[in-house]
């Protein structure tokens, strides 16, 4: 299930939230509806933590994580770090990263097993990513774009990459990640996939402008299927909501 939402008037949901198989972070702000969309779909199985990072709302841009760990930018305050540690599962290791490329969500992207990082990221940061998240990492770019986290999104079963990614490049990345990939867009033609889309292994959240065709591509490549222990009535309500939105955009 891929669910449309927005943060206040922005369709860049990946800028304001981070989603993994064990937790979700959403920006603390005036948009109560944004957090409630995540809570309705994920809780109580997955905690949804409302927070800021360094006093900013761009939580998705300055954090990156998976089910095993969470990396936050050096701008994260001690109070925010303590809040995260008190709110996330004990099994999730949290580390603050001091790197000149501080927008971690734009320069690192990963699933539970492997990650792609900006070609110029510090070697020390690379080692921390591998250690805290428990993954193997590769330096890469997407369709000539070094902001790897902005132009692709993947989880454990598949991934979406920049629409101008070549076939050869996509095949190489697919072999590195060991998952199928396809090129596409979100938010009615936007190629900033990481900004407009977040996903774990059973649900994705995308901007309100995302078309039905884009939704279909997302659901197919990510092989989204709801775990049996989740209440199917919630999924049915979102199906009806998406159908209504399709008639309006």
Curated annotation (Swiss-Prot):
It is found in: Cytoplasm; Nucleus, Nucleolus. Keywords: Cytoplasm, Initiation factor, Nucleus, Protein biosynthesis, Ribosome biogenesis. InterPro entries: eIF6. It comes from the Eukaryota. GO terms for cellular component: cytoplasm; nucleolus. GO terms for molecular function: ribosomal large subunit binding; translation initiation factor activity. GO terms for biological process: cytosolic ribosome assembly; ribosomal large subunit biogenesis. Belongs to the eIF-6 family. HAMAP family: eIF_6. Binds to the 60S ribosomal subunit and prevents its association with the 40S ribosomal subunit to form the 80S initiation complex in the cytoplasm. May also be involved in ribosome biogenesis. Monomer. Associates with the 60S ribosomal subunit. This is Eukaryotic translation initiation factor 6. It comes from Babesia bovis.
């Amino acid at each position: 299930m891929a669910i449309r939402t927005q943060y206040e008037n922005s369709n860049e949901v990946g800028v304001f939230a981070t989603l993994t198989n064990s937790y979700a972070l959403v920006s603390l702000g005036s948009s109560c509806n944004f957090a409630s969309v995540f809570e309705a779909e994920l809780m109580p199985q997955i905690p949804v933590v409302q927070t800021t990072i360094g006093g900013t709302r761009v939580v998705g841009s300055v954090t990156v994580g998976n089910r095993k760990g969470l990396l936050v930018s050096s701008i994260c305050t001690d109070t925010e770090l303590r809040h995260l540690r008190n709110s996330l599962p004990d099994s999730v290791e949290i580390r603050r990263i001091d790197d000149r490329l501080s927008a971690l969500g734009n320069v690192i992207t990963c699933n539970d097993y492997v990650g792609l990082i900006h070609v110029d990221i510090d070697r020390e940061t690379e080692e921390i990513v591998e250690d805290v998240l428990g993954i193997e990492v590769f330096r890469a770019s997407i369709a000539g774009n070094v902001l790897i986290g902005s132009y692709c999104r993947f989880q454990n079963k598949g991934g979406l990459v920049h629409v101008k990614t070549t076939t050869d490049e996509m095949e190489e990345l697919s072999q590195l990640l060991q998952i199928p990939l396809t090129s596409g867009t979100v938010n009615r033609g936007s190629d900033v996939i990481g900004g407009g889309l977040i996903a774990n292994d059973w649900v994705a959240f995308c901007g309100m402008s995302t078309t039905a065709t884009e939704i279909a591509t997302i659901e197919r490549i990510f092989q989204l299927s709801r775990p049996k222990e989740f209440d199917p009535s919630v999924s049915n309500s979102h199906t009806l909501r998406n159908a209504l939105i399709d008639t309006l955009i």
